[in-house]
Design a protein with these regions (language model features):
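Histidine-/acidic-rich catalytic cores in large beta-rich domains
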Residues: 1-415
Length: 415
């Protein structure tokens, strides 16, 4: 059974300095929009940079253009920080907005806001996603929210784009799954448009040994994405727009057949945030829950690393015999650190943790203001701060709430 956030202590609860990749960590600092209290959008979307002891060393405002707060706030290669929502915003360390683009920049668009992920692909180009409202009778009799990926210049020119509804057959859905999508639109709340794919990730492939060995599916610059409602991750070939690789989708009957066999870990349920590592493997946040057509149920979250050529799972982390204590069914993120550890979070609880290859938790932080979408560990040299002593004493695990807990613990952005 999951514990309530109120059952957890707050702040840093585990820290083994010699086994961590010591640095700074981004955490969301405020709760949801509250017009009754008069909390401003800037206050809603405040992000904190904390040290390994949980002390706030710097603060940012995320995306003041949206009352919901940014789903994403990350450091990019040039040292700036990007966020999304009603607009894409890039800011410097001091919070100066150096570039911004509203999601209504397309004259023919019905603005929905930039959702989930954004990637800065060069000094002047960005990958972003919106959800276009379309009628696609070849896919569904229900009006759909169709994921639309765009590469946009800093001048607001679209130089490349991709739509999900052009590629139905490439996702590998079974006939039964396609019939469910046709009848229901898939994935939506009652009375809403069909959220048939629900993409949540944009990741351009880095240089990797798979492409060096001649496998053109993994060409650097191709786009790795993730369909939460379709239970799969996939690669888009940049030059053609075709889906050239996917992994994780199985029909419900196939997963039942695999139950209790060695292949039972070869499928995904509601995944988020896949990333190709420099060894060519792919790291995934596999949420669990109940998604798919028809839904597949798995009530624990796991982190998995796969070999994309063989499909083999080469590393997996879940919470052992009490796996359901690590369950985040709607959001999540994962980051492989330079020392081989993995940073992730139990988003529903606001719990961030660093885990070794062997499955040992060597750092843990409980956000006193509850859940948020993603986190990021940033190296000391990448922040204009004097680095702390990298080997402070271990902190004991408190037996009480060490920090005040706000009344916004149920905050969680759209999955």
């Amino acid at each position: 059974m999951n514990r309530s956030v109120l059952d957890w202590p707050a702040g840093v609860t585990v820290y083994h300095p010699d086994r961590c990749y010591n640095g700074y960590t981004l955490v969301h600092g405020r709760g949801p929009w509250d017009p009754v209290r008069g909390i401003s959008a800037e206050q809603v979307d405040r992000w904190h940079l904390i040290d390994m002891k949980g002390q706030v060393v710097h603060a940012f405002y995320g995306n003041p253009a949206t009352q919901r707060g940014s789903q994403l706030f990350e450091r990019v290669a040039n040292g700036h920080y990007i966020s999304n929502g009603a607009s894409i915003t890039e800011q410097d360390w001091d919070g100066n907005i150096v570039w911004s683009l509203s999601s209504d920049f397309r004259e023919d668009a019905r603005p929905t806001g930039f959702h989930h992920d954004i990637q800065k692909t060069s000094e002047h180009t960005y990958l972003a996603m919106v959800a276009d409202r379309i009628d696609a009778p070849q896919i569904s009799r229900v009006t759909l929210k169709d994921d639309h990926i765009m590469e946009i210049t800093s001048e607001g020119e679209i130089v490349w784009e991709w739509w999900g509804h052009h590629h139905l057959e490439e996702f590998g859905f079974s006939d039964r799954a396609k019939q469910i999508i046709f009848e229901t639109g898939g994935g939506q709340q009652p009375g809403q448009d069909g959220d048939w794919l629900h993409l949540n990730t944009l990741h351009t492939l880095p240089d990797n040994p798979l492409y060096d060995q001649g496998d053109t599916r993994f060409k650097p610059g191709n786009i790795l994405s993730c369909s939460r409602n379709g239970n799969q991750i996939f690669i888009i070939e940049k030059t053609t727009g075709n889906i050239v690789w996917n992994w994780g989708y199985l029909d419900q009957m196939e997963t039942m057949w695999l139950n209790g066999t060695e292949g039972q870990n070869q499928y995904l349920v509601g995944p988020h945030d896949p990333k190709m590592l420099h060894n060519g493997n792919i790291l995934i946040y596999d949420n669990g829950g109940g998604t798919g057509y028809p839904p597949i149920n798995r009530f624990y979250t796991r982190l998995v690393e796969i070999n994309p050529v063989s499909g083999e799972v080469v590393w997996e982390y879940a919470a052992g015999p009490q796996a359901s204590k690590f369950l985040s069914i709607v959001t999540g993120g994962v980051q492989r650190l330079p020392n081989g550890n993995t940073l992730s979070l139990d988003t529903d609880k606001g719990r961030i943790f660093e885990v070794t290859w062997e499955g040992e938790i060597v750092w843990e932080y409980i956000n006193p203001r509850g859940g948020f979408y993603r986190t990021q560990r940033i190296a000391y040299p990448d922040c204009p701060l004097d680095p702390p002593d990298p080997k402070p004493a271990d902190l004991p695990v408190p037996d009480h709430l060490g920090l005040p807990v706000s009344d916004t613990l149920d905050y969680c952005p759209s999955p």
